[in-house]
Each structure stands twice: as structure tokens, then as C-alpha cells.
Amino acid sequence: MKLQSLSIFSLLLLLTACSVRENDLWLQKAEQFYADKQIDSTLTYLNRIIPEKLEGEDVYTYWRIQFSTSPQPFIRHSAEKIEKLSQHYEKTKDTINLKEINHIRYRLFLYNQAYDKADSMLQIIEKRA
């Protein structure tokens, strides 16, 4: 009887552990989706206000590739460009573009938070595995 109850208890623990892991993975995917949406809108905005070309690609394509390989340099580069544009708009007293720049600063802040959270969740999941 004890052996049978022990195996049922073990099975319940295993199912609970698998369920928790699935929930963590679902949450991680949801946060990554949110982060991707943030980054897509940021890249679209950057491409609209900074219409430069890089190696035959538009800014959106170039930075999307850069982001997928290493997100932190993307955030740093975007923040630097946005700061320069912000200073330019402040000097020219262009309030419409300044308002948009402040909005994109906020988006970068949110993205950075989402990236940090997804990264820490990934580390937790890797420790459990």
C-alpha cells in the first residue's frame, strides 16, 4: 500500500512540475511576443524618422537582424539616436516630433524591462532543467 501511494504521489509531483514548466514557457513566449511587438513598433518608427540606408538595407531590416542576434547593442544604439534627435527637436522647438520622441523613449524603457524579465525567466527555467 505504501509503495502504491508513494508512486501516485511521485506521479502527481511530476505532473505538477511539468505543468509549472509549461506555464513558465507560455509566459516566456508571451513576454517575448510583447517584446517583439515593442521592438517592431520602435524599428518602424526609427525607420520613418531616420531614413538612412545601411548596406542596401533599410534601417528596419538592418536593426531587426542586429536585434535578433544581440539585443543590448540595439537598445544602446537606438537610445543614442533618439537622444540626438531629441536634442535637435528641443533646439528647433519642434514640439510634434519631440512628443513622438518622448513616446519612443518610453517604448524603449518598456522594451528594456520586458527583455530583462524574459532573460531572468530563461535563466530560472534553465536552472530547473
Task: Locate each region found by the language model.
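N-terminal secretory signal peptides that target proteins for export/translocation
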Residues: 1-2
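Sec-dependent N-terminal signal peptides
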Residues: 5-15
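A "functional boundary" signal
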Residues: 18-129
